[in-house]
């Protein structure tokens, strides 16, 4: 019985995740230089509406490996030199602004507030699903500070 409920919940979660990924689109990012961003509506939490934002450098031709950068506490992705360098070394580059950080802070939220680091799992799962859907077979995680704890 438990396995059946767990499987159904997993199926519903994956269905929602797929739906979220399909409905979001990339737009130019504030970093310029061809950086793009894509904001995902996530399920509401105890403060209401929640989003996370994936930033990327346009994909390199014929490259199927990517690095996903996850920032630390009280931070967000702004180090375009990092993305440029990773791109120059033959990897597609992505960075996640987790919920309530940087591009993902909404007016109803206390910036950086979470009750558990597990809240970020859905944001990272969304990023990984999107990166895979864009043709990357190999994904390496790179993190700073709190991003490494998650």
Identify the residue ranges that each predicted region occupies.
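Alpha/beta-hydrolase active-site loop
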Residues: 113-134
